[in-house]
């Protein structure tokens, strides 16, 4: 982990203005299958199954869940508990350990391990203690006078009052619900129309995946350029370091909350992921090199307006290049 400068990571690092990896000729690293320009796919592999379609519909409905108060029972996993809490370590209150009217989804893992579990089973109006242990590496805090309080590895006691409970209710898929939510914006008026819309979207996604999977399985690679693999390692570490910082942890402490012994162990477990991303980028660039493909200015402008503010122009141009390559591959593929 120490070998990678992840704190200053920039999404456009190592990319040129064309969306290519700077100084890298992809065709020197990957040999594409002879039929890459005429990939044959099976219709049965692209058509979504009923299970896939139902998962999409369920996911959509879950986005429209509404909250309603819970009465007459104790707190359960999945409930949103509105709580007041005050935390102490060795009997001393610490900064960041007190809140009023905080909404906490039980079972979400938002708080320190064990905190949410100890709320489950309590009723609205209860006041009780929750005892947890901060993970090793957890950042220090201060007391009311500004004195440092060490939290790493320390036991903390939180006095918690359960103010209220609420639960999410998922709507049913009906023509009326579709009309109300998608009639004007998307021109969808019935449940059958909505299902057809998602079926088409899944088919298109399966098409994309089938093309990429075929090329990944049938291309041969020499050694992978360290510049690309390092880029994705730095991106990975930067991403999780932001989470760790938000919770006043270092990367090692955060990795432990994810079930790893250290950040290096978390990194090692992701080696195949970094290799996959590197190979995929090489394939897209190799096709672009072999067929002299490039996005239009309009496509570059669209990519810039969507991605450049967050990822920089060069990364936006890589996205546009890969979309251009995928379009070409799909136009030249056959489905039977």
Identify the function of each model-found stretch:
Residues 1-336:
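FKBP-type peptidyl-prolyl cis-trans isomerases
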């Amino acid at each position: 982990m120490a070998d990678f400068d992840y704190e200053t990571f920039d999404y456009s690092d190592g990319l040129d203005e064309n969306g290519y990896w700077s100084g890298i000729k992809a065709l020197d690293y990957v040999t594409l299958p002879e039929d890459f320009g005429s990939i044959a796919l099976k219709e049965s592999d692209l058509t979504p199954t009923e299970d896939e379609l139902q998962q999409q519909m369920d996911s959509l409905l879950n986005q429209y869940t509404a909250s309603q108060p819970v009465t007459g029972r104790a707190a359960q996993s999945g409930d949103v508990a509105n709580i007041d809490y005050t935390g102490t370590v060795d009997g001393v209150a610490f900064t960041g350990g007190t809140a009023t009217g905080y909404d906490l989804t039980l079972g979400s893992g938002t708080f320190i391990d064990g905190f949410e579990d100890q709320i489950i089973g309590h009723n609205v109006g209860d006041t009780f203690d929750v005892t947890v242990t901060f993970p090793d590496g957890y950042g220090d805090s201060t007391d009311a006078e500004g004195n440092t309080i060490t939290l790493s590895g320390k036991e903390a006691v939180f006095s918690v009052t359960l103010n209220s409970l609420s639960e999410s209710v998922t709507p049913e898929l009906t023509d009326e619900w579709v009309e109300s939510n998608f009639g004007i914006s998307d021109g969808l008026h019935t449940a059958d129309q909505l299902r057809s819309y998602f079926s088409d979207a899944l088919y298109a996604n399966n098409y994309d995946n089938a093309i990429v999977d075929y090329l990944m399985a049938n291309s041969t690679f020499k050694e992978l350029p360290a510049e690309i693999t390092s880029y994705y390692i730095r991106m990975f570490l930067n991403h999780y370091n932001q989470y760790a910082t938000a919770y006043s942890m270092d990367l090692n402490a955060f990795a432990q909350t994810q079930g790893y012994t250290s950040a290096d162990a978390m990194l090692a477990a992701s080696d195949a992921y970094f290799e996959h991303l590197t190979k995929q980028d090489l394939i897209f660039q190799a096709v672009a090199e072999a067929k002299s493909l490039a996005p239009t200015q309009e496509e570059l402008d669209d990519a810039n307006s969507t991605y450049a503010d967050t990822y920089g122009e060069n990364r936006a141009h890589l996205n546009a290049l890969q979309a251009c390559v995928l379009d070409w591959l799909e136009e030249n593929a056959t489905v039977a």
